[in-house]
């Protein structure tokens, strides 16, 4: 379930209140999690009490939060003072803010349909990642040479490891210790893409997003995911050979940071 509020809104677990963009109602478990979380926000949120009821007043934080129970809170920017807010317009502003912060330049031809989308922020990020990944797979993922060692090869390819070969046990004289460079798509960029794809596939609630991600998973079945993908982003190459990968990298970073424990605890604020 996703709760939609504006920045500076109140959050409570009191179900007798009337919910709206200025007041969000969450479960007691989520409210308790938010109370713990707000202590790390350095004064950008505060706990207030009204008629014996506890509320959390949000600060200037905008973006998307997801509690450990799976309850989501979409926090939209205020765009008008003293007037009724339009969630669609607010989400449009939030997406522009996100694009500017991440250095993302959307394609002009897709801007209109992108802004008409009613997807929550996180689902929109998933769909944009998949859109870029579909294009990459269509063009062809880049491969690279990787050194492979085979201690039980039936034939000689590449370089024979003489020292190990002369110590070969009797009866295995026809098996070879070899090293060779294999041209494979198992480069770090592709493995990060596969890891992010797994996150999207397990997290999305949108049918179309799930179908697209499933198709891509089958197409990338030979590529192994990588552990601790967020820290591996520093190994991502920005050379000319990977020019087509530059547009998808910010989307990978956004998704990986969302699923990073430090981000879930408020380490990143937007």
Where are these regions (language model features)?
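Terminal, charged accessory segments of proteins
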Residues: 1-231, 244-262
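Helix-loop junctions and short alpha-helical segments
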Residues: 234, 238-242
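Long, well-ordered mid-to-C-terminal structural blocks that present hydrophobic/aromatic surfaces
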Residues: 266-270
């Amino acid at each position: 379930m996703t709760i939609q509020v504006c920045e500076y809104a109140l959050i409570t677990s009191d179900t007798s209140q009337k919910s709206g963009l200025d007041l969000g109602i969450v479960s007691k478990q989520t409210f308790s999690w938010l109370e713990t979380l707000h202590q790390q926000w350095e004064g950008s949120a505060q706990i207030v009490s009204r008629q014996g009821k506890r509320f959390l007043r949000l600060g200037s934080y905008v973006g998307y939060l997801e509690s450990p129970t799976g309850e989501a809170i979409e926090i939209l920017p205020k765009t008008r003072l003293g007037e009724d807010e339009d969630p669609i317009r607010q989400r449009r502003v939030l997406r522009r803010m996100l694009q500017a912060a991440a250095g993302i330049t959307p394609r002009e031809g897709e801007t209109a349909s992108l802004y008409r989308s009613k997807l929550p922020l996180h689902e929109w990020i998933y769909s944009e990642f998949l859109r870029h990944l579909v294009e990459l797979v269509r063009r062809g993922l880049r491969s690279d040479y990787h050194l492979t060692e085979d201690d039980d090869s039936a034939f000689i390819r590449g370089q024979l490891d003489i020292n190990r070969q002369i110590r070969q046990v009797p009866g295995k004289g026809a098996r070879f210790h070899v090293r060779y460079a294999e041209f494979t798509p198992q480069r770090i960029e592709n493995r990060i893409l596969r890891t992010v794809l797994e996150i999207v596939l397990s997290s999305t609630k949108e049918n179309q997003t799930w179908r697209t991600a499933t198709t891509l998973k089958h197409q990338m079945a030979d590529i192994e995911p990588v552990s601790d993908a967020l820290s591996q982003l520093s190994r991502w190459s920005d050379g000319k050979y990977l020019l087509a990968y530059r547009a998808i990298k910010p989307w990978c970073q956004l998704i990986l940071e969302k699923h990073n424990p430090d981000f879930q605890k408020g380490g990143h604020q937007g």
